[in-house]
Amino acid sequence: MKKLTTLLLASTLLIAACGNDDSKKDDSKTSKKDDGVKAELKQATKAYDKYTDEQLNEFLKGTEKFVKAIENNDMAQAKALYPKVRMYYERSEPVAEAFGDLDPKIDARLADMKEEKKEKEWSGYHKIEKALYEDKKIDDVTKKDAQQLLKDAKELHAKADTLDIIPKLMLQGSVDLLNEVATSKITGEEEIYSHTDLYDFKANVEGAQKIYDLFKPILEKKDKKLSDDIQMNFDKVNQLLDKYKDNNGGYESFEKVSKKDRKAFADAVNALGEPLSKMAVITE
């Protein structure tokens, strides 16, 4: 009897040991999987850092050309450069929060400054936009504003390598930006003087899509259906924008966009924002 009891005890211990080994193996697999996802997130974030650096580098180069046109009193050239140069900045807007006070210095609208009772501090691209498109003149004030804009663009470019960009900021920033496009930018408030809003919209969508593209391999492992849904909605938004392309590789004036198409675009961006907001699943 004692021998049987000993045998049963040994068997129980052996089974328990095997169970512990299986548990350790499962924990090890989970840990390796988590480490793999973290590595992929880190790689995607690093790639986005590079993308942002490239956009801000081109933004600075374009701003230098834009300011030179202002200095030369070349209004036609300044107007030609204005929407195209701004696209580099607008592609980076999902992480504009990381730009600190340089964002309002470069991109603030007069309405925002008035709301904050800071209109005397207004500077940046939109102030020069007003001079070019509404006041239709380049004077000493415009040239002074252009020099300040260039100074701020250089500072932002220098700051690019130190920006604190993390997956959460990228994901939330892209959702917030598209929500802004669908609810306020769609009214034409962003480019109120030049009506070059479609350039901004395209760049905003491209900036958000870059984030999706970088995280797509991770998302497809977690939720393939969600990934496909996001891609489908990006395609719909881009198709609507393509409708207003001009023959020079740019976009028509926003004034030419019908109310029906403005609503269709806002609806499409909202439809994109809903699944895009679920992309945070990749960090879980």
UniProtKB/Swiss-Prot annotation:
A GO cellular-component term linked to this record: plasma membrane
Location(s) in or outside the cell: Cell membrane
Disulfide bonds: none
Signal peptide coordinates: 1-17
Pfam families: Peptidase_M75
Superkingdom to which the source organism belongs: Bacteria
Lipid-modified sites (S-diacylglycerol cysteine): C18
Stored PROSITE patterns: PROKAR_LIPOPROTEIN
Major location category of this protein: membrane
Keywords annotated in UniProt: Cell membrane, Lipoprotein, Membrane, Palmitate, Signal
Lipidation sites (N-palmitoyl cysteine): C18
InterPro entries: EfeM/EfeO_iron_uptake, Imelysin-like, Imelysin-like_EfeO/Algp7, Imelysin_sf, Iron_uptake_EfeM/EfeO
Topology class, membrane: Lipid-anchor
UniProt cross-references to NCBIfam families, sorted A to Z: EfeO
Sequence similarity: Belongs to the EfeM/EfeO family.
Name of the molecule in the record: Efem/EfeO family lipoprotein
